[in-house]
Amino acid sequence: MKNKYHLTTDELQLFKESIAGAKKLKQDTIVHRSPPKLGKKIAPERLLQEQVDASYYFSDEFQPQLDTEGPTRYVRPGVDHFEVKKLRRGDYSPDMFLDLHGLTQKQAKQELGALIAACKREHVHCACVMHGHGKHVLKQQTPLWLAQHPDVLAFHQAPKEWGGTAALLVLVELEQ
């Protein structure tokens, strides 16, 4: 083997002797997440039915009372307000993402319904919905739709790393 460091044999021997008792360190600083379990294939008919069922909850006529002061936020009655604070601080990291850019209101409602159904099916507690800025149609409607769904515990404007004012972090109620 050619010596690429231009060391003499004595220097190499000295180095090997100095590290003779060294042991490889075990990596303990990064927590590795296990990949999500891939379940059974879900029939397309069931997925479509879940979308239709979930979009049933979204009405354009009903206007829930949302606080207009400050960032967009909501907490379902009976849910601890500390959950909204944890969303605001970024304590929850979303495991599912939905980008509504370029969708019509009807498509956006269906996709929101599908996202909530997928969160329940996959046992995902926090999701990120990116509505964008655009003409503010979806930005205004998305919180109103989410506040109507019975499986949404809370939502808050996302921290900058998850989209800032163009996104919402949503907490979904999971069955125990």
Curated annotation (Swiss-Prot):
Keyword set, alphabetical order: Endonuclease, Hydrolase, Nuclease, RNA-binding, rRNA-binding
Annotated transmembrane regions: none
Function: Acts as a ribosome collision sensor. Detects stalled/collided disomes (pairs of ribosomes where the leading ribosome is stalled and a second ribosome has collided with it) and endonucleolytically cleaves mRNA at the 5' boundary of the stalled ribosome. Stalled/collided disomes form a new interface (primarily via the 30S subunits) that binds SmrB. Cleaved mRNA becomes available for tmRNA ligation, leading to ribosomal subunit dissociation and rescue of stalled ribosomes.
Protein origin, superkingdom: Bacteria
Any GO BP: rescue of stalled ribosome
A family per Pfam: Smr
PROSITE patterns membership: SMR
Residues annotated as domain Smr: 98-173
Name of this chain's protein: Ribosome rescue factor SmrB
InterPro entries in UniProt: Smr_dom (IPR002625), Smr_dom_sf (IPR036063), SmrB-like (IPR022990)
Family: Belongs to the SmrB family.
Subunit structure: Associates with collided ribosomes, but not with correctly translating polysomes.
Organism: Yersinia enterocolitica serotype O:8 / biotype 1B (strain NCTC 13174 / 8081)
Top enzyme category: hydrolase
Listed GO MF terms: RNA endonuclease activity; rRNA binding
EC numbers on record: 3.1.-.-
